[in-house]
C-alpha cells in the first residue's frame, strides 16, 4: 500500500492500553519522523488511555461506552488535549478503516477485536495482527477478505513473525512450491513445564500468571500455562502460511530465544533469534520490508550459553491436543475451542474451577457442539455464543 513518504505514517492502535499496544507506542515514539498515532482505543483502563492521549496526541480515542466517553472527554478538555472521543464497536471500526490511516495494530484481546480487525482488512489497510481470534474464529473469512481487498497482513505474535522472517518472500505460492518441509513452532512450556501432573490440581491463578520469560496479560498468561496459547498459534500458523496442521510441529524451548524455525527440503533450517521482547516483532512489522531500531537490547549469545529443546507433553498439556484436533476438524471447531477456553480461563481466574478442569471443560464442549461451516461473521458469532452457553452450562452442572 503506497503512502506519502514525506509525512509520518498514521497508525491506529486497537488495544492501546494492553501490553502489545504499549509496546507499539514505545516503538512509535522512538521514530516520530516515521510514525504518529492516529487513533488509540482502550477498554477498561480509561485513566491510562487519557495519559496515552496526552502523550501521543492522537486525532481519535475510542472507549466502549457513553459513560466512559463523557468521562474521557472531560479529562481531555481539562488537559488541553483536542483528541476526539468515539465510542463502541462503530468507533473501533471507524478508526480501523479511516482513509487517513496507513497501518492498524490489531491488539484487542478476544472476540471483541474481530469486527474492527476485519474492518481494517476490508479497507485494504496494512494490518499488524496481534489479535488471535481473527484467525482462530474466522480464518477462512478473514484470509479471503485479505486476498479480495489487497490488505497487507503482517503477524505480530513473536512466533508467527519469526516464521514470516524465515520464509521466502513468495511463500504464498504454497509451502511445497517454495521448498518448505515443515514449520517448527517454539513454546517456552510456561511456568508448569516441570510441575508434576498431580500437582497441577492445586496451582493458583497467581502461579499460572507468573510466566518465566514474557510479560503478558492475565488471560494469555493462563493460556501459556495450559499451552492453549500454542494450540491457538498452531491454528493461526495454518491460516497465515496456508499449512495443514501436520506440517506445523510444536517444540518446547524453555529459553524463548529462538522464536520459531522453518525446515526446508534441502536440509536447511532457518531460525529467528532475539531477546523475548514484543518490540522486535512490532518494529519488524511496522517498518517491513525495512528495519528500524526497536529499543530491544542486542542478543548476548555468551550469556545464554545454551539452548534446550524437548517434545511437548500432551498428558500434562491436553489443551495442545484439543487445539490440534480442532485445527484438523476445521470449520466451526476452532471458534468453539476458543470460546470454551475463554469461559474456562475466566472461571479459573475467578477460582471457580481448578487448572486441569480448563481442558476437561473445553473437551466436553467440543464433544457436544457439532462441527459446521461458518460462511459469515454472523455464523462465527453464533458458534461462539453456542459454545459459551455450553461452557456456562458445564459450570452450572458442576456447581460452579
UniProtKB/Swiss-Prot annotation:
Pathway: Isoprenoid biosynthesis; isopentenyl diphosphate biosynthesis via DXP pathway; isopentenyl diphosphate from 1-deoxy-D-xylulose 5-phosphate: step 1/6. It catalyses: 2-C-methyl-D-erythritol 4-phosphate + NADP(+) = 1-deoxy-D-xylulose 5-phosphate + NADPH + H(+). Keywords: Isoprene biosynthesis, Manganese, Metal-binding, NADP, Oxidoreductase. 1-deoxy-D-xylulose 5-phosphate binds at residues 132, 158-159, 188, 211, 224, 229-230, 233. InterPro entries: DXP_reductoisomerase, DXP_reductoisomerase_C, DXP_reductoisomerase_N, DXPR_C, DXPR_C_sf, NAD(P)-bd_dom_sf. Its cofactor is Mg(2+); Mn(2+). It is an enzyme of class 1 (oxidoreductase). Its EC number is 1.1.1.267. GO terms for molecular function: 1-deoxy-D-xylulose-5-phosphate reductoisomerase activity; manganese ion binding; NADPH binding. Pfam families: DXP_redisom_C (PF08436), DXP_reductoisom (PF02670), DXPR_C (PF13288). NADPH binds at residues 17-20, 131, 133, 217. One of its GO terms (biological process) is isopentenyl diphosphate biosynthetic process, methylerythritol 4-phosphate pathway involved in terpenoid biosynthetic process. Belongs to the DXR family. Catalyzes the NADPH-dependent rearrangement and reduction of 1-deoxy-D-xylulose-5-phosphate (DXP) to 2-C-methyl-D-erythritol 4-phosphate (MEP). This is 1-deoxy-D-xylulose 5-phosphate reductoisomerase. It comes from Pseudomonas putida (strain ATCC 47054 / DSM 6125 / CFBP 8728 / NCIMB 11950 / KT2440).
Amino acid at each position: 500500500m503506497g503512502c506519502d513518504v514525506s509525512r509520518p505514517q498514521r497508525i491506529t492502535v486497537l488495544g492501546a492500553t494492553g501490553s502489545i499496544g504499549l509496546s507499539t507506542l514505545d516503538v512509535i515514539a522512538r521514530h516520530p519522523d516515521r510514525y504518529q498515532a492516529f487513533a488509540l482505543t482502550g477498554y477498561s483502563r480509561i485513566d491510562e488511555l487519557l495519559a496515552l492521549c496526552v502523550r501521543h496526541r492522537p486525532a481519535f480515542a475510542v472507549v466502549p461506552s457513553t459513560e466512559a466517553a463523557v468521562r474521557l472527554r472531560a479529562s481531555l478538555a481539562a488537559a488541553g488535549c483536542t483528541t476526539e472521543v468515539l465510542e463502541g464497536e462503530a468507533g473501533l471500526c471507524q478508526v480501523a478503516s479511516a482513509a487517513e490511516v496507513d497501518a492498524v495494530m490489531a491488539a484487542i484481546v478476544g472476540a471483541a477485536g474481530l469486527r474492527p480487525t476485519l474492518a481494517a482488512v476490508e479497507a485494504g489497510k496494512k494490518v499488524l495482527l496481534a489479535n488471535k481470534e481473527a484467525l482462530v474464529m474466522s480464518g477462512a473469512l478473514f484470509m479471503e477478505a485479505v486476498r479480495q481487498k489487497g490488505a497487507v497482513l503482517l503477524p505480530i505474535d513473536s512466533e508467527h513473525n519469526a516464521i514470516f522472517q524465515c520464509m521466502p518472500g513468495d511463500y504464498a505460492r504454497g509451502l511445497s512450491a517454495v521448498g518448505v518441509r515443515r514449520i517448527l513452532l517454539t513454546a517456552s512450556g510456561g511456568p508448569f513445564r516441570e510441575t508434576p501432573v498431580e500437582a497441577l490440581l492445586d496451582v493458583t491463578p497467581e502461579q499460572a500468571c507468573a510466566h518465566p520469560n514474557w510479560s503478558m496479560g492475565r488471560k494469555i498468561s493462563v493460556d501459556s500455562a495450559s499451552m492453549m496459547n500454542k494450540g491457538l498459534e498452531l491454528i493461526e500458523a495454518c491460516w497465515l502460511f496456508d499449512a495443514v496442521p501436520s506440517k506445523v510441529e510444536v517444540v518446547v524451548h524453555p529459553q524463548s530465544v529462538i522464536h520459531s524455525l522453518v525446515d526446508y527440503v534441502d536440509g536447511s533450517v532457518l531460525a529467528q533469534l532475539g531477546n523475548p521482547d514484543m518490540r522486535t516483532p512490532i518494529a519488524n512489522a511496522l517498518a517491513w520490508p525495512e528495519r528500524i531500531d526497536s529499543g530491544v537490547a542486542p542478543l548476548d549469545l555468551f550469556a545464554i550459553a545454551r539452548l534446550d529443546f524437548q517434545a511437548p507433553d500432551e498428558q500434562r498439556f491436553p489443551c495442545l491436543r484439543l487445539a490440534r484436533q480442532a485445527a484438523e476438524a476445521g470449520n466451526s471447531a476452532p471458534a468453539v475451542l476458543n470460546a470454551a477456553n475463554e469461559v474456562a480461563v475466566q472461571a479459573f481466574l475467578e477460582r471457580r474451577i481448578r487448572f486441569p478442569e480448563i481442558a476437561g471443560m473445553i473437551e466436553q464442549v467440543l464433544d457436544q457442539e457439532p462441527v459446521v461451516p461458518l460462511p459469515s461473521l454472523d455464523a462465527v458469532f453464533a458458534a461462539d455464543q453456542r459454545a459459551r452457553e455450553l461452557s456456562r452450562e458445564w459450570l452450572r452442572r458442576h456447581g460452579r
